[in-house]
């Protein structure tokens, strides 16, 4: 969320202050230039793709109530720049580029130069109440040329259906059509907006690299089939990810989306490592849930899935370990509104940080594309909106007013290491997954990622005692020496301060390192620390 990132442009509006601004609406001055200036930080973390929450013109903090899809919000760029534009209509031939738009395109160019892809939030199910076509409908009712753009339930007075099926409200839904998905007017507008940002001026190299589609299951599937064909004709390698909180097999058959924000993955990881309204699931159940993700979708889709643990719509991942017994389906709001049990927003303990790190090892090594919500890597915690959308913790802004708020260097280093491991091994990016062990009595889990003759072994001890486990791994006819890539004594992260514009941290085995584990003719004994994890592969492996 740009408002909560970093401020870099003195021409952008200042952050609001004072008691009159409640926490849901308060801005903190983050802007495009600020994110651009932090690209080296994101490189040092190992990130290769940036998904930005909505950047288009909108009156709100969250920007999911779009006023103008053609233009970047001037809060993120240059205040008042849209006033300089005149004569624009819904016709793309009339569209111009504001100074804030150009700043965004410059940002995309710089991000590309530094090795990043950029994915924007596409809010195409609904618009905002200040959206030009909707204002015209409010004024002219059924005589408006945009009368067929929205779900109007009554014309006198004008009454509409908003986001979530609510009557009225400030996010009017775009009209759906059983044949085309969206009514012709908004359908063409959405396609033209998509092309504008994918290929500015017809040049796909200057555009963004894809869209995350907000509340996408509420738009009929037939539209997404059209959308995919259109997007791939403009930019064949563009990424299309739908927001849906349940399995999405019908959308991931190769003719609609490339992937989803895979909330079922987050739910499975939480159910095993934390629990919720019920006690944690067993290792066997967890392994089967993970396996099912690779069965219900084509494997290429599974590789592309956004494997998140939390997001702007959930509580922070770290805080779930603090609230291990909090009912998962309930709103984890710190006030306990509606009679619900209050959420504990205390800072996680050392043990809770350790358990969080263990879960991240699974996120970074299982099938899919790991997605990190900003600030998780430095130890941000909190309940749901607005607590999960606090400003980013930056080292150069320390010390903070709250002495408990600090940049968690140990956690950051663990993220860097795990991401570097993910980048080093092709098997972790495109390899198949196989369960090696699921010991329910001892809370042990082990699996492999396999690509041809390359194998990466992951072992998890989800218990408070050290344990040893026998595994069948490695070739059956010879010894097979492996190091633990999670152990800083066995593998070091290099080039964290990138020397070239597109470089990322790399991990290398320590010279002449002794193996952590040696398999003898396919058999090995692995010793795991309490709440420990190991990632095993030969020292020379890639």
Placement of each model-derived feature along the sequence:
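Carbohydrate-interacting/catalytic domains
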Residues: 1-7, 19-21, 28-48, 57, ...
């Amino acid at each position: 969320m740009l408002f909560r990132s970093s401020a870099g442009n003195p021409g952008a509006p200042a952050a609001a202050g004072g008691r009159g601004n409640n926490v849901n609406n308060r801005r903190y001055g983050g802007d495009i230039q600020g994110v651009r200036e932090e690209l080296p930080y994101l490189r040092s973390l190992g990130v290769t793709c940036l998904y930005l929450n909505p950047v288009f013109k909108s009156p709100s903090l969250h920007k999911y109530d779009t006023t103008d899809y053609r233009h970047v919000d001037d809060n993120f760029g240059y205040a008042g720049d849209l006033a300089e534009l005149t004569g624009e209509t819904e016709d793309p031939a009339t569209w111009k580029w504001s100074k804030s738009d150009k700043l965004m395109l410059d940002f995309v160019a710089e991000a590309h130069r530094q090795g990043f892809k950029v994915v924007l939030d596409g809010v195409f199910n609904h618009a905002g109440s200040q959206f030009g076509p909707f204002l015209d409908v409010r004024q002219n009712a059924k005589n408006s040329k945009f009368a067929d753009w929205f779900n109007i339930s009554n014309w006198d007075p004008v009454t509409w259906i908003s986001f979530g099926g609510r009557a009225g409200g400030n996010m009017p839904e775009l009209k759906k059509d059983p044949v085309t998905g969206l009514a012709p007017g908004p359908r063409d507008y959405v396609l033209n907006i998509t092309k504008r940002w994918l290929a500015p001026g017809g040049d796909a190299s200057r555009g963004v690299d894809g869209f995350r589609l907000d509340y996408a299951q509420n738009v009929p599937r037939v539209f997404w089939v059209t959308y995919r064909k259109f997007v791939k004709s403009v930019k064949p390698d563009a990424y299309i990810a739908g927001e849906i909180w349940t399995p999405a097999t019908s959308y991931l058959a190769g003719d609609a989306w490339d992937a989803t924000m895979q909330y079922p993955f987050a739910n499975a990881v939480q159910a095993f490592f934390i629990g919720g309204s019920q006690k944690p699931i067993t290792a066997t159940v967890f392994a089967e849930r993970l396996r099912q993700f690779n069965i219900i979708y084509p494997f290429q889709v599974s590789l592309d899935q956004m494997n998140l643990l939390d997001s702007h719509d959930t509580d922070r991942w770290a805080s779930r370990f603090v609230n291990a017994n909090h009912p998962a389906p309930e709103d984890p709001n710190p006030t306990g509104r509606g009679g619900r049990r209050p959420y504990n927003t205390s800072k996680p303990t050392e043990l809770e940080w350790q358990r969080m790190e263990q879960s991240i090892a699974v996120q970074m090594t299982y099938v899919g594309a790991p997605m990190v919500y900003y600030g998780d890597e430095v130890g941000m915690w909190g309940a749901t909106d607005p607590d999960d959308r606090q400003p980013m913790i930056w080292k150069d802004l320390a010390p903070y007013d709250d002495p408990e708020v600090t940049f968690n260097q140990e956690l950051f280093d663990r993220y860097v290491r795990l991401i570097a491991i993910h980048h080093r091994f092709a098997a972790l990016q495109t390899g198949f997954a196989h369960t090696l062990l699921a010991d329910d009595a001892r809370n042990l889990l082990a699996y492999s990622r396999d690509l041809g003759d390359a194998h990466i072994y992951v072992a998890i001890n989800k218990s408070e005692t050290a344990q040893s486990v026998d595994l069948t791994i490695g070739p059956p006819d010879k010894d097979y020496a492996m190091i633990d890539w999670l152990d800083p004594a066995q593998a070091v992260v290099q080039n964290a301060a990138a020397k070239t514009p597109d470089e990322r941290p790399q991990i290398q085995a320590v010279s002449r390192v002794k193996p952590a584990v040696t398999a003898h003719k396919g058999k090995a004994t692995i010793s795991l620390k309490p709440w420990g994890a190991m990632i095993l592969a030969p020292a020379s492996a890639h």
